[in-house]
């Protein structure tokens, strides 16, 4: 069975309106599945059981609760909900029936991909009840433990392989790097940005192997829903993701790592998938290199020796690591004791007590899903151990080092005065002086193959993504520094007079500039030309290649002084704003999650027996509070963290920096 056939059966196992009427949810699930031409949804019950155990295994028997509130997954906050259950079910059912008409002639694969990506937004679009509409994305999967949505539950359910071989899954972690050094080795804002984007882009290239073999819902962290690169992937498959903004592709929102549930425990299959990921990344780098050299017409100039140096300098990038924790040991489910090498004895014993507690007092006996937090922690520890095994190939390079990284020898340079600055120590370096744009190499700069790839990667991106990356660049620091001056001065007649004289004397009808987004429509002159000290015969010759005389320079200065008198002088300083969210590792590991009581509906927590909660001081037996004081880490928690980061990066940061203020966003993700 293909992943998409599995997906459809598991996705429709629970209806999205389940919280409104739990006793009738199975009948509605079959009805909605039929709308979309899906049958056999009962086969998804084992995947559903594992996903449910991950999310809500610590409930006693016979606890029932109406849909009255929604809990925030990462805090103590809650929302009280008052909705008419019957009307809500009727409206959702009607919406699904109408929406399903556009899915009936699709292949199972396209149907699965579009249901995963578009169904939620299509329902929101068609729902008429405004109160119901706002709750659709966060309708809880269980009214008793309403801290995870039905959508997150269905995502996890569809990720779990529990058809032919019950619980046949592995938790998988993949990472590429180096991160800090690769991004920080920069001389321009564009270097910072492109270092971030390349790591994000290559991580997604690796993800494609999981997407194509297991489906997009198998990627647990980051959640690929509405991720720009995932939407672009769907576009390339001939599908239309709803409300997709191609401009968001420029935001590198995919981190340099991902966690996935892979539907196999076979070591050879896992190794094959991992090997294919590495091959995909290496092939993408090769394609990028070849396309860039071809576009810059460098490929025909390189000797065989230079090509060999280029290949050697790219061969160990990126560093790629992966680890997997199978959920089976031989033919049996993995047990808590099988993970004892990763934890202290106290931790193992505590989890054994918790498992026993859930087994004896819980609504259902726990299954392998109960151990997700242990699996994830063991996975991270395995990755830490793997990274300590540093693989390297000894390479000896004698010569002048790269201006950017200082690690590898210069292979490409621009030097207009003293070529021996590079050729004396690097006789095989390629002289690109006056042969490419100075945005890729400035005078006196020499780059290794990897840093040259980073500097010119936009050329490849323009070929891959089209106009999104056309003329991609960042404003100069002078443009940023004088932005508030330009905004204040642009409507003054003196501003127009200065611009007119500038173009008259230079005889240049138009200058290509990279302005701040907020000033883009009004910008005609680059910021540096609004600083009086930059108005010199030499500067015009060096920067624009034009000759102006001293009299014209004085006239321009007089015009500029008149403008200063009205608008003030432009500032010579700018700020770099660095905003970092601390403790991401602790959030992902569950260390900072709220107390266990905040997972439950507040009425349910009040109804739980004191001995179950651990509030009965007369009894020596441990309850929830003693055994698991904080919420258990689940895939839904990982999804919530990912969604918050994605929404912040895509919907808020750029708007705040570029639309509301005079700034330029370099990186957010």
For the regions a protein language model found, what residue spans apply to each?
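Regulatory/sensor and coupling segments of signal-transduction and defense proteins
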Residues: 1-669
């Amino acid at each position: 069975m293909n992943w998409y056939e599995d997906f459809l059966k598991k996705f429709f196992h629970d209806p999205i309106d389940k919280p409104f009427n739990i006793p009738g949810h199975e009948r509605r699930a079959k009805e909605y599945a039929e709308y979309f031409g899906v049958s056999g949804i009962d086969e998804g019950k084992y995947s559903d059981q594992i996903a449910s155990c991950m999310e809500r295994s610590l409930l006693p028997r016979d606890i029932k609760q109406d849909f009255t509130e929604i809990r925030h997954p990462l805090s103590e906050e809650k929302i009280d909900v008052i909705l008419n259950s019957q009307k809500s079910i009727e409206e959702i059912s009607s919406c699904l029936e109408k929406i399903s008409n556009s899915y009936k002639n699709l292949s199972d694969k396209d149907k699965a991909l579009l249901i995963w990506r578009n169904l939620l937004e299509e329902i929101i679009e068609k729902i008429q009840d405004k109160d119901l509409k706002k709750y659709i994305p966060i309708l809880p999967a269980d009214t008793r433990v309403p801290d995870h949505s039905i959508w997150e539950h269905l995502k996890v359910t569809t990720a779990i392989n529990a058809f032919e071989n019950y619980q046949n899954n592995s938790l998988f972690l993949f990472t590429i790097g180096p991160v800090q050094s690769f991004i920080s080795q920069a001389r321009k804002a564009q270097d910072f940005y492109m270092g971030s984007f390349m790591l994000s882009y290559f991580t997604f290239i690796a993800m494609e192997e999981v997407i194509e073999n297991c489906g997009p819902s198998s990627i647990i962290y980051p959640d690929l829903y509405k991720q720009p690169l995932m939407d672009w992937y769907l576009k390339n498959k001939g599908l239309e993701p709803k409300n997709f903004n191609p401009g968001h592709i420029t935001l590198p929102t995919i981190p340099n790592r991902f966690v996935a549930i892979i539907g196999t425990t076979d070591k050879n299959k896992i190794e094959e998938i991992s090997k294919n990921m590495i091959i995909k990344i290496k092939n993408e780098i090769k394609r990028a290199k070849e396309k860039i050299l071809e576009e810059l017409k460098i490929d025909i100039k390189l000797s065989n020796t230079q090509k060999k140096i280029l290949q050697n300098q790219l061969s160990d990038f990126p560093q790629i690591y992966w680890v997997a924790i199978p959920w089976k040991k031989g033919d049996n489910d993995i047990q808590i004791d099988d993970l004892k090498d990763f934890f202290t004895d106290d931790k193992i014993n505590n989890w054994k007590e918790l498992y026993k507690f859930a087994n004896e007092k819980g609504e259902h006996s726990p299954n392998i899903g109960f151990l997700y937090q242990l699996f994830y922690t063991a996975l991270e520890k395995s990755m830490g151990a793997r990274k300590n095994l540093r693989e390297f190939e000894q390479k000896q390079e004698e010569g002048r080092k790269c201006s950017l990284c200082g690690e590898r020898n210069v292979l490409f340079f621009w030097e207009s005065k003293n070529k021996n600055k590079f050729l004396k120590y690097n006789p095989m370096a390629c002289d690109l002086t006056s042969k490419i744009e100075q945005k890729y190499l400035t005078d006196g700069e020499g780059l290794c193959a990897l840093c040259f790839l980073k500097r010119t990667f936009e050329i490849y991106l323009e070929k891959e993504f089209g106009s999104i990356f056309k003329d991609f660049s960042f404003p100069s620091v002078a443009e940023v520094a004088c932005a508030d001056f330009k905004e204040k001065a642009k409507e003054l007649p003196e501003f127009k007079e200065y611009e007119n004289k500038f173009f008259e004397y230079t005889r240049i009808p138009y200058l290509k500039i990279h302005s701040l987004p907020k000033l883009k429509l009004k910008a005609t002159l680059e910021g540096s030309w609004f600083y009086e000290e930059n108005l010199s015969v030499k500067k015009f010759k060096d920067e624009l290649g034009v000759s102006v005389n001293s009299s014209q320079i004085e006239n321009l200065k007089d015009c500029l002084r008149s403008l200063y008198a009205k608008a003030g002088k432009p500032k010579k300083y700018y700020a770099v704003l660095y905003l970092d969210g601390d403790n991401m590792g602790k959030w992902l590991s569950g260390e900072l999650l709220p107390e266990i009581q905040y997972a439950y509906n507040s009425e349910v927590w009040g109804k739980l027996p004191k001995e179950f909660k651990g509030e009965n001081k007369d009894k020596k037996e441990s309850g929830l509070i003693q055994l698991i004081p904080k919420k258990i880490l689940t895939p839904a928690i990982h999804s919530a963290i990912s969604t918050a980061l994605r929404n912040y990066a895509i919907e808020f940061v750029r708007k705040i920096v570029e639309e509301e203020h005079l700034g330029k966003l370099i990186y957010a993700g």
